[in-house]
């Protein structure tokens, strides 16, 4: 069976972009079982409350939920098991160094298939304060209102 080309997004973590300031992003592979891959191909995954953490010089993804494969048998996987992230040693060392800085964490932003391989986009993130979140919401509302007004003006519906 030929490998599909392109990028097919399975799950996005929109809440992470709201709760954190993303400083840098990395693409990592994941060590998965067969039923996990089949469940991901069916578009079933959740990144809510997921995070990456260092253990014994390796990075692991915790809290990602991949539901059991519907047609799976006794070989089905544990939905919230810890999954190893596959990165180059230099990338792992760089990410571990960044997480040891105060206030920085690793959060998954997207899970997708890239040329047939399951990948996760990891973001180096710093937690936002409540007032930062409010500022972002106010800024987004202002931009939306300006776009709406510009659309009305271009259609000749200006009051």
Swiss-Prot record:
Gene3D superfamilies: 2.40.280.10. The keyword RNA-binding applies. It is found in: Cytoplasm. CDD domains: SmpB. Residues 150-159 have a biased composition (Basic residues). Residues 133-159 are annotated as: Disordered. It holds the Pfam family SmpB. GO terms for biological process: trans-translation. Its main location: cytoplasm. Keywords: Cytoplasm, RNA-binding. One of its GO terms (molecular function) is RNA binding. InterPro entries: SmpB, SsrA-bd_prot, SsrA-bd_prot_CS. GO terms for cellular component: cytosol. Residues 133-147 have a biased composition (Basic and acidic residues). Belongs to the SmpB family. HAMAP family: SmpB. Required for rescue of stalled ribosomes mediated by trans-translation. Binds to transfer-messenger RNA (tmRNA), required for stable association of tmRNA with ribosomes. tmRNA and SmpB together mimic tRNA shape, replacing the anticodon stem-loop with SmpB. tmRNA is encoded by the ssrA gene; the 2 termini fold to resemble tRNA(Ala) and it encodes a 'tag peptide', a short internal open reading frame. During trans-translation Ala-aminoacylated tmRNA acts like a tRNA, entering the A-site of stalled ribosomes, displacing the stalled mRNA. NCBIfam families: PRK05422.1, smpB. This is SsrA-binding protein. The lineage of its organism: Bacteria, Bacillati, Actinomycetota, Actinomycetes, Micromonosporales. The gene is smpB.
């Amino acid at each position: 069976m030929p490998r599909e080309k392109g990028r097919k997004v399975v799950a996005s973590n929109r809440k992470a972009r709201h709760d954190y300031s993303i400083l840098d992003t990395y693409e990592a592979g994941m060590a998965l079982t067969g039923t996990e891959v089949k469940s991901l191909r069916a578009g079933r995954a959740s990144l809510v409350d997921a995070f990456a953490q260092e253990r014994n010089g390796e990075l692991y993804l915790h809290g990602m939920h991949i539901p059991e494969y519907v047609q799976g048998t006794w070989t089905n996987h544990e939905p919230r098991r810890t999954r190893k992230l596959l990165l180059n040693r230099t990338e792992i060392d760089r990410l571990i160094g960044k997480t040891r800085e105060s206030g920085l964490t690793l959060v998954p932003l997207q899970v997708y298939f890239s040329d047939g391989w399951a990948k996760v986009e990891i973001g180096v993130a710093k937690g936002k304060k409540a007032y930062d979140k409010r500022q972002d919401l106010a800024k987004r509302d202002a931009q939306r209102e300006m776009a709406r007004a510009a659309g009305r003006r271009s259609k000749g519906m200006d009051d």
